């Protein structure tokens, strides 16, 4: 038997403990909050509550009733071959009836009873207080009258006792004094009494006012409760109405129920009348013809075909007005899905897109903008859906409510190639990074932080070669100050101008370091003049840019450059949140064979710690290890500190934002969503075809393609090389990067190259053993490079070999016809004198008459005297027979030429 305490039972049924104890007492059970309640006592309490609410049946009347109707009929259908079969048809109807009146009356009665009880209690309290006040006033009046009578009797007794005059006078004086004193005492008592009455009256008024306010508040609460119940009931009715609109099987409205029953009754009566008239007509027909008429067919005959009642036949009326609805469009959508959302055929959508100038198929993915234009063109209202709600929620769930503190500046070294950027940074770091790069040029973004006497500075060293434009732009976006290194002997070069444009686009201050001032041909003033043409004005000329003359080789003014950087940083007042979850930017990334994906992250805010979960573009992972630029293990990194992190799921793209998140599962979902979105957008862009490009696409079939599989050591090099190779494409030869990636060359790359007939280019990477075996077996061209110049030059040579050669005709000899002879075998033979060059046998010729070409063919016979010869030189006579041409005349000229093939190259 299950027993509960009174307190547990009150929590279970949602009733206050005091209220439940009162109900138990009313039911004849005296309990406390800690007593046990048995099942019999619960049943007894339930019976008491039902009787109290007027329910004596003991069983609750059901508030919802569901009725089901089934109607069966038989339909004869044609089964083919002159036969028919009977099909049983069952029509099911289901209706649900809800008893609302009991619920509404009960709730209304409870609200009225609560308000009535509150009002009665308030009136009862007010009556008790009034009776109490009257009793106190009666007691006070009785005490005053008694004191007055006692005073009068005392005075009378004193007067009667005085015998003589002195005694009388003395008694009189005493009586007067006593009366005077009594009067004074009485006045004092009266004043005290009045003051007490006034105080009591004020207290009673205050108590009365509080009782009235409490009663009014209770009434207001009861009224608000009734209004809320009324609103809740009305909302419930609206919800019920919505349910009726949604599901026509569930009808809770009494009027709708009655109307439906009335319609069913009328339909049934009409069917019965129709059936009765048919049966009577059939009976009369049988009476007239002498018996019933039965249609027979086949061997044993068959039943007559039953006609379906007209009321049961389906009728479809096509709407004349096209339904306009809200169309919800995601970032990408398939054409067929868009048509379904607009309730039109997919061919209509394709027609609209063709009118707008875009070709599409029924299963093609289109972007959000195109779908929006199509839907609005067809008159629908478009609702653009944001599919990155999870991404925004994950990125916004951060605890960065900390105070910002000053941070070190991030300085990017920019400039033209070989102007001394890395050498300047070398002198600052006291290292030799320049010697470590192949060819002495920087091909990666190097991130370093340097401790100086006045503070810490973080440097980003960018390449200066034209192929690394994306790297320089990425460096400018993550920086606070740009130091533009310009050689004093070279002046402003193309990459110098490009670096100025990147700095201005990023909106960061520019400090110009004029390098190589120790050379004899150095001309710093010329550098200032050239830079002024690009709105880079020195401070001494009234501009905003600081110029520092340095020598990276000798270390001249390097300290002044650092002071200038720190001064500019102090003006900028750079701050960042040091505590909390970290966020930064990926400066560089690569695939290490032993450690996996490695990303160089520049922390911009917060503190990145070992073990944090990092979301980085399409990749995610837990930080397994962190190393600084020297290679030492670190456990945390604050703002403006570059570190290498290990543990990501893949190699992120350089420039991606790295953010620390709380949940690894959500980070994986966001990364997968980003990857899927990237694929969808890429597919939508690739499949987009314009009508005006159709003919150019058809003509593109004659273009030769050079397929390349590119692998490099870091992501930045992959981007730079792929961009440079793509720009080499011409109208005749197209460079197609079929595959690119970071890390060593694997067997998968070899299979891809074999399938696409591509060459493999490795930049600072090598192929493993399995890849080398696959490459040798398939005879794939594999080349390794460490300098980007050599890679681009060799690709140019390969493209030049794919170009169609040019052909040039060169005249090698000229002969003048002096006489014409007839030969029975060869026809007309021209006797000629060679005037220029030499005449070769089987060479193509032209016959000129009055310097006009009248025939073009080839030599058939070349003789000197009676001997066949291979060639005849200038100044000799010969006989020439022209193949398939006999109209040779004296004075004609025979021009002999040959076609020379000229090899083309790509500039």
From Swiss-Prot:
Sequence segments annotated as region (G3): 461-464
Record: residues binding GTP: 415-422, 461-465, 515-518
GO cellular component: cytosol
Annotated region described as Disordered, given as residue ranges: 26-317
Compositional bias ranges of the Basic and acidic residues kind: 28-44, 101-248
One function term, GO molecular function aspect: translation initiation factor activity
Residue ranges of every copy of the tr-type G domain listed in the record: 406-575
Region (G2): 440-444
Principal location class: cytoplasm
CDD domains: IF2_eIF5B, IF2_mtIF2_II, mtIF2_IVc
Compositionally biased spans, kind Basic residues: 299-308
Annotated region (G5), positions in chain: 551-553
Annotated region (G4), positions in chain: 515-518
Region (G1), start-end ranges: 415-422
Keywords attached to this entry: Cytoplasm, GTP-binding, Initiation factor, Nucleotide-binding, Protein biosynthesis
One Pfam family from the record: IF-2
Compartments where located: Cytoplasm
Record-linked HAMAP family: IF_2_B
Family: Belongs to the TRAFAC class translation factor GTPase superfamily. Classic translation factor GTPase family. IF-2 subfamily.
Role this protein plays: One of the essential components for the initiation of protein synthesis. Protects formylmethionyl-tRNA from spontaneous hydrolysis and promotes its binding to the 30S ribosomal subunits. Also involved in the hydrolysis of GTP during the formation of the 70S ribosomal complex.
Name used for this protein in its record: Translation initiation factor IF-2
The encoding gene: infB
């Amino acid at each position: 038997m299950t027993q509960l305490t009174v307190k547990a039972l009150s929590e279970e049924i949602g009733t206050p403990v005091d209220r439940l104890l009162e109900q138990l007492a009313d039911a004849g059970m005296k309990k406390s909050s800690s007593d046990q309640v048995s099942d019999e006592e619960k049943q007894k309490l339930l019976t008491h509550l039902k009787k109290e609410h007027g329910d004596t049946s003991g069983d609750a009347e059901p508030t919802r009733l569901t009725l089901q109707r089934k109607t069966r009929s038989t339909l004869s259908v044609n089964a083919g071959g002159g036969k028919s079969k009977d099909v049983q048809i069952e029509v099911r109807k289901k209706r649900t009836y809800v008893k609302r009146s009991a619920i509404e009356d009960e709730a209304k009665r409870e609200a009225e009873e609560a308000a009535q009880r509150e009002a009665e209690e308030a009136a009862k309290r007010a009556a008790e207080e009034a009776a109490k006040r009257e009793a106190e006033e009666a007691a006070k009046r009785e005490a005053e009258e008694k004191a007055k009578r006692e005073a009068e009797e005392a005075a009378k007794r004193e007067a009667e006792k005085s015998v003589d005059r002195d005694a009388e006078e003395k008694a009189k004086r005493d009586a007067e004094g006593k009366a005077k004193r009594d009067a004074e005492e009485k006045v004092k008592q009266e004043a005290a009494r009045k003051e007490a009455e006034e105080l009591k009256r004020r207290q009673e008024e205050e108590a009365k006012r509080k009782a009235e306010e409490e009663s009014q508040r209770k009434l207001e609460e009861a009224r608000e409760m009734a209004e809320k119940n009324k609103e809740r009931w009305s909302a419930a009715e609206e919800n019920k109405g919505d349910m009726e609109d949604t599901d026509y099987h569930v009808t809770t409205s009494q009027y709708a129920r009655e109307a439906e029953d009335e319609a069913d009754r009328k339909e049934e009566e009409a069917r019965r009348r129709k059936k009765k008239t048919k049966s009577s007509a059939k009976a009369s027909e049988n009476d007239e013809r002498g018996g019933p008429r039965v249609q027979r067919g086949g061997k044993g005959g068959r039943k007559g075909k039953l006609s379906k009642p007209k009321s049961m036949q389906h009728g479809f009326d096509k709407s004349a007005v096209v339904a306009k609805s809200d169309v919800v469009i995601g970032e990408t959508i398939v054409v067929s899905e868009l048509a379904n959302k607009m309730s039109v055929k997919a061919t209509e959508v394709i027609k609209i897109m063709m009118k707008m100038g875009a070709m599409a198929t029924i299963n093609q993915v289109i972007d959000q903008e195109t779908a929006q234009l199509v839907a609005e063109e067809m008159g629908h209202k478009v609702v653009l859906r944001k599919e990155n709600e999870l991404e925004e929620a994950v990125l916004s769930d951060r605890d960065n409510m900390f105070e910002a503190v000053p941070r070190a500046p991030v300085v990017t070294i920019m400039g033209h190639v070989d102007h001394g950027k890395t050498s300047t940074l070398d002198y600052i770091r006291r290292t030799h990074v320049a010697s470590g790069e192949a060819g002495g040029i920087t091909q990666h973004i190097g991130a370093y932080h340097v401790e100086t006497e006045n503070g810490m500075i973080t440097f980003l060293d960018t390449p200066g070669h034209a192929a690394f434009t994306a790297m320089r732009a990425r460096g400018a976006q993550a920086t606070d100050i740009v130091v533009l290194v310009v050689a004093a002997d070279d002046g402003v070069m193309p990459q110098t101008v490009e670096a100025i444009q990147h700095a201005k686009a990023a909106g960061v201050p520019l400090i110009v370091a004029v390098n190589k001032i120790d050379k004899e041909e150095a001309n710093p003033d010329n550098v200032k003049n050239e830079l002024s043409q690009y709105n880079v004005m020195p401070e001494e000329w009234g501009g905003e840019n600081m110029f520092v003359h340095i020598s990276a080789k000798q270390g001249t003014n390097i300290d002044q450059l650092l002071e200038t950087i720190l001064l500019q940083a102090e003006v900028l007042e750079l701050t960042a949140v040091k505590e909390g979850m970290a966020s930064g930017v990926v400066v560089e990334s690569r695939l290490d064979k032993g450690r996996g994906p490695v990303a160089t992250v520049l922390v911009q805010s917060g503190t990145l710690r070992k073990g944090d979960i990092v979301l980085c573009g399409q990749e995610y992972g837990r930080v397994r290890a962190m190393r600084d630029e020297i290679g030492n293990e670190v456990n945390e990194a604050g703002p403006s500190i570059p570190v290498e992190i290990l543990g990501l799921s893949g190699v992120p793209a350089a420039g991606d934002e790295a953010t620390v998140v709380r949940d690894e599962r959500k980070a994986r979902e966001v990364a997968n969503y980003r990857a899927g979105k990237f694929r969808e957008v890429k597919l939508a862009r690739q499949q987009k075809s314009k009508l005006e490009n159709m003919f150019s696409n058809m003509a593109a079939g004659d273009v030769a393609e050079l397929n390349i599989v590119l692998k490099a050591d870091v992501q930045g090099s992959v981007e730079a090389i792929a961009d440079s190779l793509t720009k080499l494409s011409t109208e005749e030869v197209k460079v197609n990067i079929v595959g690119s990636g970071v890390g060593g060359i694997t067997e998968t790359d070899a299979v891809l190259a074999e399938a696409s007939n591509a060459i493999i280019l490795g930049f600072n990477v090598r192929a493993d053993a399995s890849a080398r075996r696959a490459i040798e077996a398939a005879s794939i061209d594999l080349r390794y490079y460490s300098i980007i110049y050599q890679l681009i030059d060799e690709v140019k040579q390969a493209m030049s070999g794919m170009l169609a050669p040019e052909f040039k005709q060169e005249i090698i000899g000229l002969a003048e016809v002096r006489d014409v002879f007839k030969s029975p075998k060869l026809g007309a033979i021209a006797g000629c004198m060679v005037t220029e060059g030499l005449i070769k046998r089987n060479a193509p010729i032209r016959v000129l008459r009055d310097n006009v070409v009248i025939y073009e063919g080839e030599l058939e016979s070349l003789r000197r005297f009676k001997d066949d010869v291979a060639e005849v030189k200038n100044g000799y006579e010969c006989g020439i027979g022209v193949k398939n041409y006999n109209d040779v005349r004296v004075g004609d000229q025979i021009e002999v030429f040959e076609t020379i093939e000229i090899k083309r190259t790509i500039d």
